[in-house]
Swiss-Prot record:
Homodimer. The active site is at E12, D197. This is 5'-methylthioadenosine/S-adenosylhomocysteine nucleosidase. Belongs to the PNP/UDP phosphorylase family. MtnN subfamily. Pathway: Amino-acid biosynthesis; L-methionine biosynthesis via salvage pathway; S-methyl-5-thio-alpha-D-ribose 1-phosphate from S-methyl-5'-thioadenosine (hydrolase route): step 1/2. One of its GO terms (molecular function) is methylthioadenosine nucleosidase activity.
Length: 232
């Protein structure tokens, strides 16, 4: 099995990259892909860059060039669920765009023409992630993760997301674009991210302060998940 892993930022991939044995670096379309073995398992780790376009471009290049069997999207996210705090884990059962609006033509808010309203994560990957969470004794929430090209840092943006997606547990900037590409390629995916901030008026301050905490937690989760997927 070859496992594809996608993170947007240097801080979100550096700990995993340093653990890859026999590492080789491929630069394509402004993205960097690191291939090798993570604890004996073949992996391809992509640093995509921030935002939906960068994430979709990178995911497409990763799938075409490295042919992974599954995709894990990792990194940080802003917490929306009331039980979440910095360092906690969110696992997607579905992802949706929070900044797409074609409702004038009868589509659901967040749905693009020709696409499902949301992109469902793979049940087996979800189950494996939840098993890792239990083993690591981490606090986690599974649910809807929403994505858009905006860092949510204020009451207006937050209120709009809560109105349109009252069940959303986290918000970030890449996951749905990655899920969209995986859907088109028919490749199983799951989002496993750690909370770096709560999406409020101080989120930009807590993000800068706690990104390293989120990166450490998400790296631990992904490393454990890769082991479980490879060896059961």
């Amino acid at each position: 099995m070859k496992i594809g892993i996608i993170g947007a930022m240097e801080e979100e991939v550096t700990l995993l990259r340093d653990k890859i044995d026999n590492r080789q670096t491929i630069t394509l379309g402004g993205c960097e892909i690191y291939t090798g073995q993570l604890n004996g398992t073949e992996v391809a780790l992509l640093k995509s860059g921030i935002g939906k376009v960068a994430a979709a471009l990178g995911a497409t290049l990763l799938l075409e060039h490295c042919k992974p069997d599954v995709i894990i999207n990792t990194g940080s996210a802003g917490g929306l669920a009331s039980t979440l705090k910095v360092g906690d884990i969110v696992v997607s059962d579905e992802t949706r765009y929070h900044d797409a609006d074609v409702t004038a033509f009868g589509y659901e808010y967040g749905q693009l023409p020709g696409c499902p309203a949301g992109f469902k994560a793979d049940d087996k990957l979800i189950a494996a992630a939840e098993s890792c969470i239990r083993e690591l004794n981490l606090n986690a929430v599974r649910g809807l993760i929403v994505s858009g090209d905006a860092f949510i840092n204020g009451s207006v943006g937050l209120a709009k997301i809560r109105h349109n997606f009252p069940d959303a547990v986290a918000v970030e900037m890449e996951a749905t674009a990655i899920a969209h590409v995986c859907h088109n390629f028919n490749v199983p995916f799951v989002v496993v991210r750690a909370i770096s901030d709560v999406a409020d008026q101080q989120s930009h301050l807590s993000f800068d302060e706690f990104l390293a905490v989120a990166a450490k937690q998400s790296t631990l989760m992904v490393e454990t998940l890769v082991q479980k997927l490879a060896h059961g």
